[in-house]
């Protein structure tokens, strides 16, 4: 089982090494959905492998049979087995606690902000179900959830023409329909658990950028790409409030350039290769459990 722990640690190290390469890969902007799937697989596999390393090391003295290991651990336990078990338990508990805390905090923030928007915002029948807040600062964002809201400021209505405004609104509706908030939330919790790990910080940044690209692509199906890029540049300094997703929160210049000078989509064989790679990465933790049983 010590060999299994070494193999699991090696697999985790490989994932951490590959993260910067994936963050710098240019093909991701050509297939954001496929890239996002791969990032999700990396996040899942990395978190589970970190737990498996500690658990496998803790059970190593008892041999390869996990059930027998629970009954046959030596008394007293070696200090390193106790340390490994404590670290694994602490990491798991912190990860679950941060995930629950982040989820509850985000839900509360959105509920509070939604109530505030309903109190102070006005509705414009020409803008569908969009809430308009009285602020000169140009900002557009959505509040996802069971009762979503798309919010724009009067500054946006002043800064954008009609076509640009409708493009931005469709971008925000894409976040709502595709539930991008559920994609981002686990990575935010992972960063809160491992705040000093560069690979985790890179993953959060890239996932945020990719969901914005997906929303851009959905909006670009109904609107001119140049119009959307121009709208992003006009409100590019805005920041969505906590709990919200905004059209201008991640990589505005990169996204505008992508809209104005679109690269050809990643060919189907390339997308298939990415999906297979994501599947292989997601199965690494399963292999980490099977190997000790072999």
Task: For every predicted segment, state its role.
Residues 30-42, 70-76:
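Membrane-interface segments at loop-to-transmembrane junctions
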Residues 9-12, 42-45, 84-90, 277:
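Hydrophobic alpha-helical transmembrane segments of polytopic
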Residues 1-14:
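Hydrophobic transmembrane alpha-helical segments in integral membrane proteins
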Residues 283-294:
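Juxtamembrane boundary at the C-terminal end of a transmembrane helix
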Residues 268-276:
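Membrane-interfacial entry segments at the cytosolic side of transmembrane helices
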Residues 48-64, 68-111:
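Transmembrane alpha-helices and immediately adjacent membrane-cytoplasm interface residues
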Residues 13, 17, 26, 36-37, ...:
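Membrane-anchoring signal-anchor transmembrane alpha-helices and their immediate flanking context
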Residues 18, 22-35, 84, 92, ...:
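Polar-ligand-bearing catalytic/cofactor-coordination segments
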């Amino acid at each position: 089982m010590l060999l299994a722990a070494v193999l699991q640690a090696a697999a985790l190290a490989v994932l951490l090494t590959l993260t910067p390469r994936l963050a710098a890969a240019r093909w991701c902007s050509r297939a954001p959905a496929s890239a996002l799937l791969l990032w999700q697989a990396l996040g899942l596999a990395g978190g589970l492998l970190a737990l498996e390393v500690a658990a496998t090391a803790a059970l190593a003295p008892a041999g390869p049979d996990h059930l027998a290991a629970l009954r046959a651990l030596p008394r007293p336990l070696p200090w390193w087995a106790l340390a490994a078990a404590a670290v694994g338990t602490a990491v798991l508990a912190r990860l679950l606690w941060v995930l629950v805390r982040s989820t509850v905090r985000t839900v509360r923030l959105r509920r509070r902000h939604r109530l505030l928007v309903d109190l102070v915002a006005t509705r414009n029948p020409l803008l569908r179900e969009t809430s308009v807040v009285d602020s000169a600062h140009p900002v557009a964002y959505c509040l996802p959830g069971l009762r979503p809201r798309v919010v724009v400021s009067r500054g946006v209505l002043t800064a954008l023409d009609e076509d640009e405004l409708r493009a931005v609104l469709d971008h925000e509706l894409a976040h709502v329909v595709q539930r991008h908030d559920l994609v981002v939330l686990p990575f935010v919790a992972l960063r809160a658990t491992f705040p000093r790990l560069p690979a985790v910080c890179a993953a959060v940044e890239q996932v945020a950028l990719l969901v914005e690209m997906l929303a851009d692509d959905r909006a670009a199906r109904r609107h001119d790409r140049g119009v959307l890029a121009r709208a992003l540049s006009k409100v590019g300094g805005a920041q969505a409030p906590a709990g919200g997703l905004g059209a201008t929160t991640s990589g505005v210049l990169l996204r505008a350039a992508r809209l104005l000078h679109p690269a050809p989509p990643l060919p189907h064989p390339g997308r298939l290769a990415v999906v297979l790679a994501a599947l292989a990465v997601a199965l690494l933790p399963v292999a980490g459990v099977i190997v000790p049983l072999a």
